[in-house]
Amino acid sequence: MSIFANKTLMITGGTGSFGNAVLNRFLDTDIREIRIFSRDEKKQDDMRHEFQAKMPEAAGKIKFFIGDVRDLASVKNAMHGVDYIFHAAALKQVPSCEFFPMEAVKTNVFGTDNVLTAAIDAGVKAVICLSTDKAAYPVNAMGTSKAMMEKVIVAKSRTVSPEKTKICCTRYGNVMCSRGSVIPLWIDQIKAGNPITITEPNMTRFIMSLEEAVDLVLFAFQNGVSGDILVQKAPACTIETLAKAVTGLFAPGHEIKVIGIRHGEKMYETLLTNEECAHAIDLGNFYRVPCDKRDLNYDKYFKDGDTQRNVLTEFNSNNTELLNVEQVQQKLLSLSYIREELEARKNK
């Protein structure tokens, strides 16, 4: 029996890479229904046909709702009878959010508030929200909007009993081969015979697979306390290492062209800030950051400061385990997307 036996799970932004990974893992189980909520009817239609072909007996458990997290009414309309929500809807492209920051605010901040408001009103038992390492010490509009999203999540968690609705947040780094990520772009550049373009060779980034992203959300679902932020102890690599790993698999010696840092990018990313590390709880492969449960009684703040602090300091993509080219290639070869692309290239 699965953890979602006879339950209805709703995924906002569900036609994306994360939603596809959840469907692949849980659709053919004893889950009652997986509800996909998103804006794009074409992507919904593509997903419908894909799973009808891939899992014909289980595909009927997917229900599609067209709507926008910015529109509270459409969110509420999709929420009836939902037990759990994975909130993945977001604007996540750093450059576009730099040029249209208010669009990022509308989706990532107001949209999240709408999802949580509707979930609480509908009696949803648990909401797990997906955030990003760019929310820690943000320097760009996307990261800033996600940082505000996290504040909304923590604030909402204080207003509702966790027995009624548990609200948690997961924060993770780059998900390899997810929609809009760099590896599929590089593979397309290799196919076209063009140099692959990298921003800055020494830039470091956390890397994880889609399966690991789902694992993190499931860990939060099963182990998180309302108001928590949970992160995985992910490894990292330099952009140059990642580029050499990809070209080594697809086209050894292929040209790598440095184009410089884009709008809003940092040299390294942070999964846990120094302040969060002070009270983070080590859970093996994960860290749990509990929210501050104190209220607005400021006298209490002066009396009850941080009485217990960890020695753990900032957890970032420079001080985590840094993988070499061979180690990154091993992670890449574990991905079905990479194996399929390599097979197609071999059969050309």
Language-model features and meaning:
Residues 12, 79-88, 129:
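Rossmann-fold scaffold of SDR-type NAD(P)-dependent oxidoreductases
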Residues 8-29:
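N-terminal Rossmann NAD(P)H-binding glycine-rich loop of SDR-like oxidoreductase domains
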Residues 63-84:
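Conserved Rossmann-fold cofactor-binding substructure of NAD(P)-dependent oxidoreductases
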Residues 87, 91-147, 151, 155:
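Conserved Rossmann-fold NAD(P)-dependent oxidoreductase catalytic core, especially the SDR/UDP-sugar
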Residues 38, 65-66, 106, 200, ...:
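Conserved residues in the N-terminal Rossmann fold of short-chain dehydrogenase/reductase
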Residues 30-43:
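Conserved glycine-rich Rossmann-like NAD(P)H-binding loop of the short-chain dehydrogenase/reductase
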Residues 64, 104, 167-170:
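Hydrophobic/aromatic anchor residues within beta-strands of the central parallel beta-sheet
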